[in-house]
Amino acid sequence: MIVGIGVDVVDIERFGRQLERTPGLRDRLFVPAERELNTRSLAARFAAKEAVAKVLGAPAGMNWQDCWIGLDQNGPTIQVKGTVLAVAESKGVKRWHLSMSHDGGIATATVLAEG
């Protein structure tokens, strides 16, 4: 059963400027394993986190580090803890599906939550 679908797009250049202008933003949005990635990859991961938030109804108290994008042999994976995990469990989410891409200055992510 599909619990929810979320989609988000991020302007890569604008996102990069925000990271440069705002000290500590990279640390607030990303876990240590994500922080060293290039701007295109960070923009796609932020789009994925936004898409997860949309699936869950943008839960109050959501910490951006409670959701991170890992990689395994099959591609990107969504990892959750804290508030994001609690809300996902309350909605019956058992499995996440993620597709990310970037082209023409735009990063995009689509998230499907399955129960």
Curated annotation (Swiss-Prot):
It catalyses: apo-[ACP] + CoA = holo-[ACP] + adenosine 3',5'-bisphosphate + H(+). Belongs to the P-Pant transferase superfamily. AcpS family. Keywords: Cytoplasm, Fatty acid biosynthesis, Fatty acid metabolism, Lipid biosynthesis, Lipid metabolism, Magnesium, Metal-binding, Transferase. NCBIfam families: pantethn_trn, PRK00070.3-2. GO terms for cellular component: cytoplasm. GO terms for biological process: fatty acid biosynthetic process. Its main location: cytoplasm. It is found in: Cytoplasm. Mg(2+) binds at D8, E50. InterPro entries: 4-PPantetheinyl_Trfase_dom, 4-PPantetheinyl_Trfase_dom_sf, ACPS, Ppantetheine-prot_Trfase_dom. HAMAP family: AcpS. It is an enzyme of class 2 (transferase). Coiled coil: none annotated. Transfers the 4'-phosphopantetheine moiety from coenzyme A to a Ser of acyl-carrier-protein. Its EC number is 2.7.8.7. Its cofactor is Mg(2+). It comes from Arthrobacter sp. (strain FB24). This is Holo-[acyl-carrier-protein] synthase. GO terms for molecular function: holo-[acyl-carrier-protein] synthase activity; magnesium ion binding.
